[in-house]
Structures are given as C-alpha cells and as structure tokens.
Amino acid sequence: MNRNGSTKDPRRMTGAATGEISRYFNDKAPKDIRRAIEKADKDDILSTTYPYDAEMTAKDYRAQMEALQIELVKLQAWIKQSGARVALLFEGRDAAGKGGTIKRFRENLNPRGARVVALSKPTEAERSQWYFQRYIQHLPSAGELVFYDRSWYNRGVVEHVFGWCDEEQRERFFRQVMPFEHDLVDDGIHLFKFWLNVGRAEQLRRFHDRERDPLKQWKLSPVDIAGLDKWEAYTTAISQTLTRSHSDRAPWTVIRSDDKKRARLAAIRTVLSGIDYDNKDRAAVGQPDAAICGGPDIWDA
C-alpha cells in the first residue's frame, strides 16, 4: 500500500488497458473538456489562454526546423571538438511532447555522441542507493550531448503524486537538488532543464488519439491512465517543484506545448542560443518564442 492508501502500483501493470481513455472521456472527463475536444478541428488549439489559435503551418515549421537542425549539427561538431559536456533534462505533463522534441533534436545528429537516457522504475538495489546515484552514471562525458527523457525530477512530481516516496524523502530531494545541479554546472556541464506543459483538454485529446492508433498505443502507459484523475494533484506538485528547484545557475525553461511544432522550435532555439559554438548563424538561430517560452511564471498560464 502506498501513502495514498492504494495497493495498486500502475508501474506493475503489464500494459495500458484497452478502452480506458475512451471510458474516462465518456464517463468522467469534465464537461467543458469533453465539449472542447468534440467541437475542435484537428489543427485547432484547445487552450483558451494559448497565444495562438491554430498550429503552425507545416511549411513554416519545416523551413525553420531545417535551419535549426543545421545549427545542431554545428553544435555537435563543436561539442566533440572542444570536449564540452551538455545535459538536457526533459520533464513535463504526460503527452506534452517530450519524446517528440528529443527526436527532433537528434534527427540529424551522430547518435554516438547524442545519447538518450530513459530509465525504468528503480530496482531494489537502486532504491537502496542515494537517490541521484542512478542518474549520475549517465551524465555526459567529454564531447557528449545527453538527453534525459524524464530525470531526477520524478521525485518532485510523479513519485509524490502516486505515493511512491514519502514526505521526508521528497524534502531531502528538494534540499539536495539545487546544490547537486550547481555542482554539475560548476564542473563545466552545460545544463538545460525543460518543462513542457500542455493543457488538460489537449492532453486528453492526445491520449485519445494514441488509444485509437495501433502505431502509437505503446506510448500510452498505465501511469498515464492512472493519472487521469490526478490533474489537480499533478498541478500542485509541478508548481512546488518548479518553484523550489529554479535558480539563476540551473534555471527551468518552461514551454507551453499545446502546439508541438512551436514547442520543438522553442526548445531547440533555447539550447542553440545558450551555447557559443563555432560558425553559429545567429539569424537562423533567432530567439525562443517568448509568447510560449519562459520561466516558471508561465507554466500554468
């Protein structure tokens, strides 16, 4: 039994139950969320506070992405030549687009120098270790770019929401996380922390799409399903985590990802504009879209 009184651990379920998203949509989803999804066209933005009414056009997206991926190739060449170490942490709401954003970063990079770290639940041995220990072994070596698809921030959010850690463990995490990250930065690691945030209606629409698409059903995890009723608990945990782990030396970059195309471009621009690498085309890099990209103050806008 976890601290919330439940004996069920969604991490131990063998797969996402067929039809669970549809049942939630029909029987339990808030009426305004359900109506927004039912009335919308495919490219409509569902959030009423998002600064754009529709997704970026595919033509504009492709043109900008191609230019940015050329810059990423330059960045990787500089990382390899200079021995730099770069670590990118991707956190966010479920279905916010973390994996897709990482994919666009790596699309034209040499995979030998651009690793993805996506850890499963900790083993018994790992649970007995210092919490950060299993993440440390995956930090970048000289010449490497490492993408964490979820990271040590599991403790601040999902572990807390599902009762997989107690309050003492979580408080210890918050006491240690900023000194830990400052040590990484002081040692020369370029550290970028991304929080991708998506509105409730858009999240449910993406879950529903995954459930109906045989090629995407693997993306729908038991934790996603179990979390459908925990939106408010997630909101509180996210707010606490961003507030307590943001600093000038290891800041959070929050990206509103209701439009995946704009979110991917903003994330890539954040990294490219944050590192001085050789032969940078500053006009091509530009600046992240401030309407959807900023600090913790915009996360729940």
UniProtKB/Swiss-Prot annotation:
GO terms for biological process: phosphorus metabolic process. Residues 1-12 have a biased composition (Basic and acidic residues). Signal peptide: none annotated. Also accepts various divalent metal ions. Its cofactor is Mg(2+). Its EC number is 2.7.4.-. Optimum pH is 8. Keywords: Kinase, Transferase. It comes from the Bacteria. The keyword Secreted does not apply. Residues 1-21 are annotated as: Disordered. GO terms for molecular function: polyphosphate kinase activity. It is an enzyme of class 2 (transferase). It catalyses: [phosphate](n) + ATP = [phosphate](n+1) + ADP; [phosphate](n) + CTP = [phosphate](n+1) + CDP; [phosphate](n) + GTP = [phosphate](n+1) + GDP; [phosphate](n) + UTP = [phosphate](n+1) + UDP. Uses inorganic polyphosphate (polyP) as a donor to convert NDP to NTP. PolyP hydrolysis is slightly faster with UDP, but it can also use ADP, GDP and CDP. Belongs to the polyphosphate kinase 2 (PPK2) family. Class I subfamily. PANTHER family: ADP-POLYPHOSPHATE PHOSPHOTRANSFERASE, POLYPHOSPHATE:AMP PHOSPHOTRANSFERASE-RELATED. This is NDP-polyphosphate phosphotransferase 3. It comes from Ruegeria pomeroyi (strain ATCC 700808 / DSM 15171 / DSS-3). The lineage of its organism: Bacteria, Pseudomonadati, Pseudomonadota, Alphaproteobacteria, Rhodobacterales.
